[in-house]
């Protein structure tokens, strides 16, 4: 919110997960009063579903959104149909079978846990405390 985007950008690109959720994304759009598009951050159908919900909650949406990136994944835990270039705002329910099939290996799970520990010990705990965030 601290950046003055006037005369710096023409269109605000909103990505739900990196911005902290739908409510925060909506608040940013309202604050900056710029035309917006919603794009994904190469997420599963669950994340894409949140992007679709954000797009559906915006008062105006004059540009095409970038929410079809799920097609870049070899597999996904749910399907979001695209009909005539459009996606419906709807609940996204992951397939239990797909989640079992796509479950990360023990080695990959350990890799991610180690990565989070390294980030935390590199100062994330201090930043969270300084920002007043709750973990």
Q: What residues fall within each predicted segment?
A:
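Catalytic core of soluble alpha/beta enzymes
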Residues: 1-50, 55, 74-82
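Flexible C-terminal active-site loop/helix
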Residues: 41-135
């Amino acid at each position: 919110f601290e950046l003055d985007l006037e005369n710096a950008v023409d269109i605000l690109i909103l990505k739900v997960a990196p911005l902290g959720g739908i409510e925060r994304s909506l608040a940013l759009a309202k604050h900056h009063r710029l035309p917006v598009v919603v794009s994904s951050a190469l997420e599963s159908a669950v994340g894409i579903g949140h992007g679709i919900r954000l797009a559906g909650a915006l008062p105006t949406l004059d540009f095409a959104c970038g929410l079809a990136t799920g097609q870049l994944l070899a597999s996904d835990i749910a399907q979001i149909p695209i009909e005539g270039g459009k996606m419906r705002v709807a609940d996204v329910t992951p397939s239990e079978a797909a989640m079992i099939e796509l479950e990360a290996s023990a080695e990959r799970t350990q890799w991610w846990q180690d990565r989070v520990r390294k980030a935390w010990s590199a100062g994330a705990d201090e930043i969270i405390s300084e920002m007043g965030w709750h973990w």
